[in-house]
Amino acid sequence: MNYDKLNAYKLTARYLVLIDCGSDGIGSGDIHASFDDACDVYDCQMDFGDASTVHAIDFTDGTTQDVTAEANALIAKRCNERAVDLPTWLEGVL
């Protein structure tokens, strides 16, 4: 999904950060109203070493889209703008 589509999707979507808590298959989810908030939580969880993904959920259309790549790009962009190093977990992803 590109940024134009993501921006259009933001009008009706909520964002779910899925957190995989290990091999037991038990995880959790955290729903956010904004993509930026979801990216903050995703970044934090990845820093803690919890494998996570970000999904846009459009309750109006009943659709979902994996937007983890867009979350990674936003976090990299933030690091670049702030002139800080990428998180270690993100270096291996990009």
Q: At which residue positions do the language-model features occur?
A:
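N-terminal non-cleavable signal-anchor helices
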Residues: V17-D20, H55, L94
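Long, charged, low-complexity intrinsically disordered regions
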Residues: Y3-L6, P87-L94
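A short, charged, amphipathic alpha-helix used as a generic interaction element across diverse proteins
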Residues: G22-F59
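Short aromatic-glycine-(Arg/Gly/Cys) micro-motifs in beta-strand/loop hairpins
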Residues: M1-S28
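Short, mixed-charge low-complexity intrinsically disordered segments
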Residues: M46-W89
